[in-house]
Every structure is written in structure tokens, then in C-alpha cells.
Amino acid sequence: MQDHQFSYEVDAPVEDVWAVFWGRKTGDVIQLGKVRIEILHGGDDNGEGLIRHCHFPVPWYLLSGGKAKSWEWLTQVKKYESWRYDAVGKPLWSKATGWTRLDALDGGRTRVHFRETYHVFNPLMRFLLEKVVHNAISKDNDQKMKLGVERGLKARGRAATQPSHIRASGN
């Protein structure tokens, strides 16, 4: 099993950062470069039960045309605080679990913590490919998530004006 975690800070209060992640409705589509996220079910008022279908690039040697899909559902949603997702992905049949937590900081800033575990079902494929594929899939997640939050804040009229930092660990 692979485990990747990182955190970063943004110049916005928790409520504004939460709003970037939440408030999606059934049928919404989020496109960030080669990553496409379709909201299949928006969940309840807090996002509990949200279901999304994700399309993202993977290494060519998986023989899928460089494309992968995952089906994800969100649970354990605590408004303005944290949530969890579970996912099943292919072509390398796998399970991922992710946790996101928001911490309010002084000065109206927020620290975002993210952790994901990744597990390939087939024992042979797990031995041969799990680590290298997870590294390929998650190599830019830190920057992409931070950039997505900052763009979302800017679109909401709350630009991140101070430098933010990313700490990553895992694998």
C-alpha cells in the first residue's frame, strides 16, 4: 500500500476554502488540465454522499491510451473541517482512500492537509506496478490541488496574496 500526504497554506479563511471544494451540484464538471471530474450526485447540503467520476492521465505502459478512471464517494463530511473519500480506479484496478482536513490559522489563513492511500488489488500487479503508478498519478497532486484552491479563491474574489508552502511526505 502506498501512502502520500502533504499540507499547504492559503491566504483565506476556512469558510472560503471550504466553498472552493464544496457546493457542487449533480451534473457539474470540473476540468483542470487533463483531469476531468464529473459530479454524478451532489450529496446532501454538506456534501455527504457526493459521488464523482474522475478521468486522469496514467503511464502509457498500462495500455489504456494513457487514460484512467475512478469512481469516488465522499463520507465523514464535517463542515468547515474535514472529509474522506473512497475510490475504485482502473485500468490498474485499485482502491484509494483520501482524507482532507482544514485548519484555521491566525490572520485569516488556512492550512489544508491531504492524505491518500493507494492499494492495487491484484498481488502481482501490486508488486510490479503499485509504487511506480501511484508515484506517476500523485506526482503533481500537491501543486495541482494548491493551484486549484488558489484559482477557486480568486474566482470567488478572494485571491491568495501571500506565498504559500507545501510539505509533502509519503511513499
Provide a role label for each language-model segment.
Residues 1-47, 170-171:
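Hydrophobic ligand-binding cavity/cleft-lining segments
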Residues 5-9, 36-38, 53-55, 84, ...:
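Ser/Thr- (and often Asn-) enriched beta-sheet segments in non-cytosolic proteins
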Residues 28, 38-91, 143, 147-170:
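Glycine-rich portal/gate segments that line the openings of hydrophobic small-molecule binding cavities
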Residues 11-15, 44-48, 75-82, 101-113:
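A short, structured loop/turn motif at beta-sheet edges
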Residues 3-5, 65-71, 94-99:
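Short, surface-exposed coil-to-beta transition loops
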Residues 10-12, 56-60, 91, 118-122:
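Beta-strand elements of well-folded, non-transmembrane domains
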Residues 86-143:
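Beta-strand/loop substructures that line and gate deep hydrophobic ligand-binding cavities in soluble
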